[in-house]
Amino acid sequence: MKNIANHKAVAMIELIFAIVIMAIALMSAPMLIHQSIKSSFVGMQQESINTLSSHISLILTKEWDEVNADTQFNPSILVVDGGDDKLGIKNDNRYRAGTFNPSQRTFASDEGGNAKKASLTSNFGENVDGTEKFNDIDDYDGNKAVVSIFGDTTSTGSDYIDNQIEMTTTVRYGGDSTDSGDYNSDSTIVFNHPFNETLNTSTNIKLISVQLTTKNEATELSKNIRLSAFACNIGNYSLSIRDL
């Protein structure tokens, strides 16, 4: 007669532990999926912001005004109609207050000595003034750029989720007066937020705003993001050629 040894139920206990651990892991799965989806949305928002930033950076590489883009003039300071008086011409050398002498940053003038003025807002926009397109900042006013894949504006037939991405650019003049302090005599000034005040007359500040929108049936995928920047009427340096 054989004696059968009694075995402890170790295997059963291990099975129970395994089931409990798997249950805990599965309970966290929905939360992990939710966080993964949110991370994807954040990633697409960051891509949109990066696209906006690149577009604004491109605009800021252009000349401040159409007059600056004219090759017969150095990219110098322009006279404005509605700017702060303390930022105007201060002496016969056509310097602005605070500019060292000598400097290329002088007010531009034509051959007759007449000061060159910044463009009117009525001349803002693509090819409005009849000159080369997109050679200065205000040419981008009203420009609507469509981001697409290989020319497909709807991205149909691709696996790209974001589609119908549009970037609309607005360029305006902004107030350049200080809230407190003096440009010429004070070491500290408090400056008004220029985007709170857009003007139809020319000033020393151009405000650039680019708004990105997407059209998507899913609410969480629709975007309406705006980035802004400004550029000042401060002229530019020009390279000198030394005779050897």
Give the residues covered by each predicted segment.
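Flexible, low-complexity segments enriched in proline/glycine/serine and punctuated by aromatic residues
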Residues: 16-20, 37-46, 53-244
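N-terminal single-pass transmembrane signal-anchor helix
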Residues: 2-36, 48
